[in-house]
């Protein structure tokens, strides 16, 4: 049961969490984002620069607590300078528990990265095929947790009660690589947020002062928060007020459809494809293959242009690299999964109000820092499972682009924000079930896109061991040390099935990750066509 009294902690300053950040889609997910560097980095340099960053941005050491009096019902309890100093001392103490540490260092320099994560190890050693697509499994769960997030929270219930930072870091050094991970609750924000933190870490690593965050506590979407339905005046007028329109491709379920959807999900999770049969896989597309897919898509659309009676001026047939990559992924997912061809497939992607503001937005609404999120679910127009497999790549990419174009209309973005705030606030969810398919009996999947965050540009050369351990004022600067792979994992009370991430560019190619059964990963009509790394 949620408390009616705001939590107060001595030595901490309370700052409300933004309303959109406090929706269930964010409170339910704890994420880890790892950059894999093909070098032996100095763990001490990474540690000292992380502490320097936290001192500049103390919100990274904040606790998260319930504060019913605030619009979101949640607040960051940010340590004062004196408290932060005490927390850092505790964190540095080797006798402290992992959950008490802002950053954990793990020296595995006696091991090769190949023992831990074979497909990414091939990127570390520049051994991935440059002309063909590769696929491989994630590390064993227990090994991964020890390697990247041993000090991270594992559930929302734990996070809002424990004396623990909601953002933590871990650096693990192997003989041939170093992993650097940021673990966080999704209330912190989105991929742009984590890129911003890595950039701040890079700045501190370079020995430069990290600028203080501006506008901490400014809520970018507070003006879209619907009136409090507990307000007596609002209740009195409620019947005369029109219900807000739902955004495109979202549907409100009544009791019958709600029961049907829940029963189908239980059958899927417990009987048809139990969670224990799913594994996480990573897929690498070399740049040569990306270029090939783009050429194929352009050829498909040129054929459509020449065969269509519709004038090219009436329909824009251009597609982006993201459109094509997403189309390729969806073709393979549907070809690899046992779905009845005639079954409707409902696909959701992520759009971001940071770059596509809602109607009514003015620039001054947004804080001057990046530690907040703007991610929103955007369903594509429905297709059958067969269409996802058989449509030419270019036409499927066009379908994706046209669906997203509708979704990013400012008025539709406004509706998406309002829907999230009206129905899925952690403080008080509406209890209504909204779903991105009109029919409960549908195949569904989703994909988030981190490519635009450009994690591959992070440069940790200042921590390169030879350079760091033998710094001379006249020494030439070390060559750039950029990640060759991006990996991720998450903790959620919901199923991880059918969730994918376009992780972005690294090692002159594109990385994806998602959940598959072993049979799906080896299906010769889909992912089984590619090089399997084990």
UniProtKB/Swiss-Prot annotation:
EC number of this enzyme: 2.3.1.-
Main location: membrane
Practical application: MELs not only have high potential as eco-friendly biosurfactants due to their excellent surface activity, but also have attracted considerable recent interest because of thei runique properties, including self-assembly, anti-tumor and cell differentiation induction activities, and moisturizing and hair-repairing properties.
Pathway annotation: Secondary metabolite biosynthesis
A GO term for molecular function: acyltransferase activity, transferring groups other than amino-acyl groups
Protein localization: Cell membrane
Top enzyme class: transferase
One GO CC annotation: plasma membrane
Domain of life: Eukaryota
Deleted gene: phenotype: Leads to the secretion of large amounts of deacetylated MEL D.
Keywords: Acyltransferase, Cell membrane, Membrane, Transferase
Membrane topology of this protein: Peripheral membrane protein
Active site location: 186 (proton acceptor), 459 (proton acceptor)
Annotated family: Belongs to the plant acyltransferase family.
Function recorded in the entry: Acetyltransferase; part of the gene cluster that mediates the biosynthesis of mannosylerythritol lipids (MELs), surface-active substances that enhance the availability of water-insoluble substrates. Mannosylerythritol lipid production is responsible for hemolytic activity of Ustilago maydis.
Name of this protein: Acetyltransferase MATC1
Naturally occurring in which organism (per UniProt): Mycosarcoma maydis (Corn smut fungus)
